Amino acid sequence: MTMSRLPLSAGICIAALLAAHPAVAQKKGGDMVMAQPAGTNTLDPHFTASAAARNMMLSMYETLMVIDENTTPIPHLAEKVTVAEDGLAYTFTLRKGVKFHTGKEMTSADVKASFDRFGQLSPEKTTMASVERIDTPDPYTVIFRMKALDTSFLDRLASPASPTTIIPTEEAGKPVNKTNMISTGPYQFVEWEPDTHLKVKRFEGYTAAPGKAADGLGGKKTAYFDTVTVRIIREASARVAALEAGQVQYVEDVPVLAAKRLESNAKLKVIDLLPAAQPVMLINSVQAPTNNAKLRQAMQAAVDMKEVMTAATDGNFKLNHSFVYPNNPYFNDAGKPYYSVNDTKKAKQLLAESGYKGEPIVMLTNKDYQYMYKSALVMSEQLKDLGVNIKLEVLDWPTMADLSRKREGWNMAASGLAIQPFVGPYSFMKLFWGATHIAFADKDPVLEEAWTKFNKSLKLDDRKAAWTQIEGRMADQVYVMKLGDSGNKLAMARNLSGFKPYAGAVRMWDVWLD
């Protein structure tokens, strides 16, 4: 039987580009401090998918597959992956000599134990739904035997949206939130205070992947800092002040007006990342009264997304109806007829048809992410004008994120998608399908059929058609309101060198202080 091979060197396409620029002397040492607006109440390697947690965990935790600079899946902890001709077996040859932070060498037993744990405990365990079993014929070979064709399996293994982190066997047997923060990354855990900071230090035993340079979330990664500290500073003005005072070297989510001021500071630099994320409004489809599709459709018809996004982002946005960006091959217009309709007459008609009696609708938001707070404020007023009884609840981000994963206690929740729109449709599978559906529409037959087609189709055109059907259904049933595409102002010390912005993730390897 012939097999297709994906070698480690595949996708490392930026090395030549880097070589074309003058060499810059990298410097080892120093303590890097970055500030972000929100934290996380879990660092469990298999139990979180938020952007805040990803920034904190990315330098510690690693996976078999990663995405490169162009979001193409490439091997990382694996040397190569071989795919059977019928697509029913994936054979990973592991890199030899890869060390965990404990000094123990990673073997196939650790990989199997990690995936077993992920498949049992992770909220995103649908990644493993097509896997029949995992074989480990020797210490450096792992074979995934599939129940059925799953054409996006490698894409999902590579996605950082919900990482399938490899941890030691002895950690994999522990319950949620009881593991030590151990993996194979270039930095290792030092300390964590959930409300204030995470600190990591350079892992001196790190075994970098072969190659000339880092590439996306893989390639040859080098830890230059002695330590990296991620500080949680919720107020934007306080983050900016800390940067100006030299207390931190990097901040994200800088307000537009503050960014303009920072641009005149010779000691600082500002990078504009647009698009950077997609603000959304989640809608609980099983909690009354938003379990009424007509009511959801009425609210969607009333909203003016331009007004919402202008307030949420200080004007740093683009209107976009799709859950992927316009340059993505899966971009389509299925959701366009439902987007930013702003039609009061139509909305009132749908509201009357829904039989809505003024029951309270609980809308969750938080001030950690100002775009979530501002978007909720504006949308709540638009919906009140329609005659909807909105009750706004302002929580901290970790509490809000936890509550929005429960089937009761809320109706709407201001949130955002960071990595998913950048990576593509397969990263939405965990959010828009089955038991992990973000709006709890786990028995929607249209989504079930479309995702099944997406996973079993070998032709790109067939997968595009399936994704178009998915986007149309999400919009028609109003499980999630897509608000638009937002930008992110990143500000940093001018002597922070090597930093490259990457949508949905902050990379602190191959970065140093001059």
Model-derived segments and spans:
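Aromatic- and charge-enriched surface segment that lines or borders ligand/interaction sites
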Residues: 79-124, 137, 143-145, 242, ...
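Short, well-ordered beta-strand elements
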Residues: 29-39, 79, 89-92, 111-114, ...
